[in-house]
Amino acid sequence: VMLAAGKHVACEKPLAGTLEDARAMADAAKKAAKKGVKTFVWFNYRRCPAVALAYKLVREGRLGRILHVRARYLQDWGGPQTPLSWRFQKKVAGSGAHGDLNAHIVDMARFLVGEEVSEVHGAIERTFVKERPLPGKKGETGKSDVDDVVLFLASFAGGATASFEATRLAIGHQNDNGIELNGEKGSLRFSFEDMNVLELCEGGDARTGGWKRIMCTSAGNHPYAANWWPDAHVIGYEHGFTNMAADVLRTLAGLEPEVPLPDFADAYQTQRVLEAALQSARQRRAIKLSQIK
């Protein structure tokens, strides 16, 4: 409705609760785009300075051809003691860790690699906690029917292999949104639990090789750093949302964002990967993305 009325739209991720709804939204956005209407999806982790720097390094060819991707999003707040809420009810949330967490890391992997996923296989979906305490009702429980864990393997169009894992039952991991890329010339890795740091390892002289930690807080050298505090002063979770909002406003003003913003068409590709993973888990076979329309 808003797109048809010519309004720019920013949407939470994932794009929709179902593939069909996501497709309808992407189609509506494509039609509205012909009239200059823009869409955005709130994949805020792209706006972390370290992730934006990783994007730039990959585009500069510092890693060479990407061979492997390992992505994870591990949290520990969803144990059996956690009271029932909308997040654990499929009719409201749509999915559990898959839509909540895998959506982020699939988007991040696609964003960094710069290619689409071509096939998903080896997927596993589990619901371990099927009853949860009802808030304010001592001794009573309610049904929890979303996935607690979804993990899967994938291939990118250019041949790179990938693994994805999402869970809210990993004790000791509060918000470990992490990714590692291995290329022919180097590797990089990031974890949101150390969000101001990007780790980089470039091949070459074995005497001086190895991982180095880059504090992404230098104005003029690191994305978004000039917008905040003096050099070496770190930022936090909330600053990613501000960076996102700033890039949206820059785009609406006709300026370039620091790094590309996901629109409905982009987010629909992530939704297709999520759907392929669920089909792979339930059918116990490989699913080509060409099958997911």
Predicted regions and their residues:
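Aromatic/hydrophobic pocket-lining residues that form π-stacking "cages" and hydrophobic walls in ligand
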Residues: 25-28, 54, 276-277
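C-terminal glycine/acidic-rich active-site capping loop/insertion
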Residues: 111, 133-145, 151, 155-158, ...
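Stable alpha-helical structural segments in soluble proteins, enriched in small hydrophobic residues
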Residues: 236-240, 244, 274-283
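C-terminal lid/capping helical subdomain adjacent to the catalytic/cofactor pocket in oxidative enzymes
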Residues: 268, 282-293
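Glycine-rich phosphate/pyrophosphate-binding beta-alpha loops
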Residues: 103, 165-173
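Predominantly a Rossmann-like dinucleotide-binding segment in NAD(P)-dependent oxidoreductases
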Residues: 35-40, 45-144, 198, 284
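Beta-strand-loop-alpha-helix segment that lines the small-molecule cofactor/substrate pocket
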Residues: 1-46, 61
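Short acidic/polar mixed-charge low-complexity motifs
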Residues: 158-160, 169, 184-187, 285
